[in-house]
């Protein structure tokens, strides 16, 4: 079952989307069915240029193979990319793969971290 969403997080997403040089990509552990329902419920998901869905790939985070699918599919250079996730192990795997990372705790904390990086 899908719940609500944090409007401040959506505002951050919209702000990043408006920045010309930022390509937003997603990596989710949703099932295929949940993702398709979410796409209908949450129009802000259209701000992502692409999303890798674990249900489609039959692999879940924190399996590094799922991250590699994201990297390969979208030609990501991890050292020039920021990975944001609310689960610590997922952030640690991304760090191991060379990503800059932010462990999401709250919308305010995320905004502060992005400001420190000069992204907001």
Regions found by a protein language model. Name each.
Residues 35-42:
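Distinct, well-ordered alpha-helical segments
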Residues 30-33, 57-58, 88-89:
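Short, solvent-exposed loop/turn segments at secondary-structure junctions
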Residues 1-25, 64, 107:
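Short, acidic loop-to-helix structural element flanking the phosphoryl-transfer center
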Residues 60-88:
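Conserved Lys-Pro-Asp/Glu-containing loop-to-beta segment of HAD-superfamily phosphomonoesterases
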Residues 50-58:
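His/Asp/Glu-enriched short active-site or ligand-binding loop at hydrolase and phosphoryl-transfer sites
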Residues 46-50, 78-81:
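Short acidic capping loops at alpha-helix termini that bridge into adjacent secondary structure
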Residues 78-114:
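Acidic, Mg2+-coordinating phosphoryl-transfer loop and its flanking beta/alpha structural elements
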